[in-house]
Amino acid sequence: MISGLFIFNLKGDTLICKTFRHDLKKSVTEIFRVAILTNTDYRHPIVSIGSSTYIYTKHEDLYVVAITKGNPNVMIVLEFLESLIQDLTHYFGKLNENTVKDNVSFIFELLDEMIDYGIIQTTEPDALARSVSITAVKKKGNALSLKRSHSSQLAHTTSSEIPGSVPWRRAGIKYRKNSIYIDIVERMNLLISSTGNVLRSDVSGVVKMRAMLSGMPECQFGLNDKLDFKLKQSESKSKSNNSRNPSSVNGGFVILEDCQFHQCVRLPEFENEHRITFIPPDGEVELMSYRSHENINIPFRIVPIVEQLSKQKIIYRISIRADYPHKLSSSLNFRIPVPTNVVKANPRVNRGKAGYEPSENIINWKIPRFLGETELIFYAEVELSNTTNQQIWAKPPISLDFNILMFTSSGLHVQYLRVSEPSNSKYKSIKWVRYSTRAGTCEIRI
């Protein structure tokens, strides 16, 4: 149970003080300021002082703090604090000290709906929006304003809609054109050796949805037939991320880990049929998140050659080949490190632009459009000054940033997307599915 919730600014001033139970002393805010904010030893999100546990997170110029007694499930409380921050950001557009000060009444009423006697009730924005009588208006210039909902309309909405089985979607939504967008966005972390071998690779992905659909529609989309969620330990040890033909491992299975879903997703259908079925929330939402370490499609084959011909000259030769289909393209940005005592750098490339940036000791190579199944070559001669006290160059890795549209490194893809409305047999909608893979931390050793 949460005994109290507080929002402080960076100085420790109390902006919001909301108690849900009668087991807190008045000194709890002062204890947080003195014992935690001013004490560098307390830099953990969970701190126990006496019989109280302080669970807090920092956002912009705010500290959002929950205080509990006894032995609570702190992970649930931390998740609630993150949901509270997301909800307030959703309502205000931006959450900071000024927006909190201008929306105190709204925040108090919102907390009354979210927590009842210390027990978390809901964090769903649509359900909360229908149950509070004060509506926060997003920023217009530098000012925020509040509008009060009509009380009779609110009472009708609260009694008729909130107790339903779909708290994340209100009834009576109407659009002139029904449309739904599914985006699968992946970030790849990659480490490549100086010989071009993949030392480590992993993918974190999210399935995002933007729904502008009338009524109470049923949506479903199917994922890969060859979809798996875990490997046996003996199998996992025998596999390697270094494979240059990921589809040959495990018969081309897409292997996902740590899958998490929005509450609207019906999990039994996903587990049994690899089908995501749901009644969508209105607007944008993250339907699913996942990670993958196996059977990853590495989009590029990169071989770096860095040779020091003498104390005054280094030769760079980097070849990169796109291993995705020819109809796709990507944008790339290489940050190639050079020693600090560079006198002159002459990069030559067959695509894009490359230039020496002395302030960062790098050569920046930007390729706006790199077609699949093609190869690019980077070549540079770097002249160094002859200094006797120069330290040995540590050879930091090359960093790579990229973005590939209509490509997923995990291999995850949508086979079909269907939208129907039980009360309307002629229901029509526009459906889009998009994919993208972006660089996380991608490094190439030299």
Swiss-Prot record:
Principal localisation: membrane
Modified residues (Phosphothreonine): T157
GO cellular component: AP-2 adaptor complex; cell cortex of cell tip; cell division site; cytoplasmic vesicle; cytosol; mitotic spindle; mitotic spindle pole body; nucleus
Modified residues (Phosphoserine): S145, S151, S152
Superkingdom to which the source organism belongs: Eukaryota
Localization (cell): Cell membrane; Membrane, Coated pit
GO molecular function, one term: clathrin adaptor activity
Record-linked InterPro entries: Adaptor_comp_med_subunit, AP2_Mu_C_sf, AP2_Mu_N, AP_mu_sigma_su, Clathrin_mu, Clathrin_mu_CS, Longin-like_dom_sf, MHD
UniProt xrefs under CDD domains: AP-2_Mu2_Cterm, AP2_Mu_N
Domain MHD stretches: 177-445
Membrane-topology annotation of the record: Peripheral membrane protein
Keywords assigned: Cell membrane, Coated pit, Endocytosis, Membrane, Phosphoprotein, Protein transport, Transport
Gene Ontology BP terms: clathrin-dependent endocytosis; intracellular protein transport
Pfam families, per the entry: Adap_comp_sub (PF00928), Clat_adaptor_s (PF01217)
PANTHER family per record: AP COMPLEX SUBUNIT MU
Family: Belongs to the adaptor complexes medium subunit family.
Biological function: Component of the adaptor complexes which link clathrin to receptors in coated vesicles. Clathrin-associated protein complexes are believed to interact with the cytoplasmic tails of membrane proteins, leading to their selection and concentration. AP50 is a subunit of the plasma membrane adaptor (Potential).
Subunit comment: Adaptor protein complex 2 (AP-2) is a heterotetramer composed of two large adaptins (alpha-type subunit apl3 and beta-type subunit apl1), a medium chain (mu-type subunit apm4) and a small adaptin (sigma-type subunit aps2).
UniProt protein name: AP-2 complex subunit mu
